[in-house]
Amino acid sequence: MDSDMDYERPNVETIKCVVVGDNAVGKTRLICARACNTTLTQYQLLATHVPTVWAIDQYRVCQEVLERSRDVVDEVSISLRLWDTFGDHHKDRRFAYGRSDVVVLCFSIANPNSLNHVKTMWYQEIKHFCPRTPVVLVGCQLDLRYADLEAVNRARRPLARPIKRGDILPPEKGREVAKELGIPYYETSVFDQFGIKDVFDNAIRAALISRRHLQFWKSHLKKVQKPLLQAPFLPPKAPPPVIKVPECPSAGTSDAACLLDNPLCADVLFVLHDEEHIFAHRIYLATSSSKFYDLFLMECEESPCWGGGAGEEVPCRDFQGRTQSLGSAEEGKEGPQRTPQADPGASSGQDLPESLALQMEASGSEGHALSGWSKGFVSMHREVRVNPISKRVGPVTVVRLDPSMQSGPFRTLLRFLYSGQLDEKEKDLLGLAQMAEVLEMFDLRMMVENIMNKEAFMNQEITKAFHVRKANRIKECLSKGTFSDVTFTLDDGAISAHKPLLICSCEWMAAMFGGSFVESANREVHLPNINKMSMQAVLEYLYTKQLSPNLDLDPLELIALANRFCLTHLVALVEQHAVQELTKAAVSGVSIDGEVLSYLELAQFHNANQLAAWCLHHICTNYNSVCSKFRKEIKSKSADNQEYFERHRWPPVWYLKEEDHYQRVKREREKEDLALNKHHSRRKWCFWHSSPAVA
């Protein structure tokens, strides 16, 4: 149907609505939202403003726009024609104002100047060109009143004037101007699709009432109401912040390989057939290989008190359990003279001369014969050695290897045990496979076979299974204290740990044990203000890079300890766990308000910023209930937190004021309508004279 036919249809009122206002206040988007049902994302709304005008000929060329222009307001069929205009003050809008039925005057609630121009420029211009045309004042961009202005300013074009908190106009500012001009006032948000129908339906009512005064014979206009009140907009609750856990740092694979090259805190020395020495660490070897686990476990059971008697000869006994056959060699009664163990509190300056170290090596006992237990080993004994990195003396387990164990493949084997990785370009794969067979490392042997068969892609699953077994063995060693070389004394007990694993997992521990601190030489380290349960959880995380699932302790205690050790990833994991537990309790109907209040400032103090943000969100979105139960606690919070509460509380203060004003004005209008209806009923009775015959 052609648009001209709307003018000819009986009882259809065609309304020409002109939309005016400053540039960039949202006139065109408001028109498009009504005429085309356009919805925009916040990114589109914040895009660079390009002055545009919505073309009036859309009603002629677009059937959908024409259909949407038709509506029924107060039982009156209407056809709404929207006229867009440029916001430049110097433009001539005389043609647009011609024969207009209503003018919608727009300003932005984020631009105080646009509201000032309503009084100083726009209203005067409207009354100059169409003095009898009704006007409706509209505050656009309502969503900016509750938006995150920092995010909004970041999303806008670089040279745009930033929107400040003081620029946002409260509803009463627009209402005061509307009252001064004697016109109705409404607010809209294209982003939230709020107020669009209110604005144009009430603009239509204003136009129809004005027309009714001139065309009083049109009976269908008698039911038209005066512009209605607009209920205030309740902004949606802000979504809770998502706890983001950063990418897990590497599980120490590269650091472990580096530790093999720079054997800090080494407690194993392999002696090859050509007297080449390779330092290593029991905990890495034992947790990666069952063969080495049996070897070092046998050593621990043979000499459980090695730390206190470095110079004593250790008698041999038959090892029963996991080993199959172990021959024991009796030592001579006149044992070799050994250098006593250094004082644990000695400083790093107490170094042993290299000649003395060589003398200890030359005079070392053959110890336990291992040739009958494994083809790869000859003997094992203990000595006090000088660490090549720290230059400090300490006990080491000296393992002499069989001449068949070549240096190159053995170093590759050790690197695999430390990192779980095998270089496909390794030269002596055959020698490595034979060595893996001798030491019963079947996963390494399979990986070598896959590489030789051009099927290296199959090694991924083997590597994954290797790391799972290693993690389980590490957790077992942590819980039992097996192969430990340091003990942490805490407020409520002690816990054993392993320096090599700590050095590779935590920079704080690496600085303490790898530097010149006295703790690097001590087997016992005192950590004040730490309980055993929290330290156990931190150590388990450092060993496995996972948070213990059976976490039965105060999250803030663990966060405080993780922050003390500079473990940001662990802090994020505990934050996520704490939020999950709080959310679960809230869903089950348990009040978490008091717990959240107690978490807030402690989380801020210990740099748990994500947990603090979640607590702030919970308090703000439940502000009324929290404040009613914990008013003193709310008032005791820091000034910054209280300012945040006031700014982000839900419902916001401006909404509560608007709701109160709306209810008050609504009651007043209902009283006026009731009085008006009584007045009309009295007038009807005054002109009604019933005759006795009719009665």
From Swiss-Prot:
NCBIfam families: small_GTP. Residues 325-351 are annotated as: Disordered. One of its GO terms (molecular function) is GTPase activity. Keywords: GTP-binding, Nucleotide-binding, Repeat. Highest expression in heart and testis. GO terms for biological process: small GTPase-mediated signal transduction. Residues 266-426, 484-551 form the BTB domain. SUPFAM superfamilies: P-loop containing nucleoside triphosphate hydrolases, POZ domain. This is Rho-related BTB domain-containing protein 1. GTP binds at residues 21-28, 84-88, 140-143. Gene3D superfamilies: P-loop containing nucleotide triphosphate hydrolases, Potassium Channel Kv1.1, Chain A. It comes from Mus musculus.
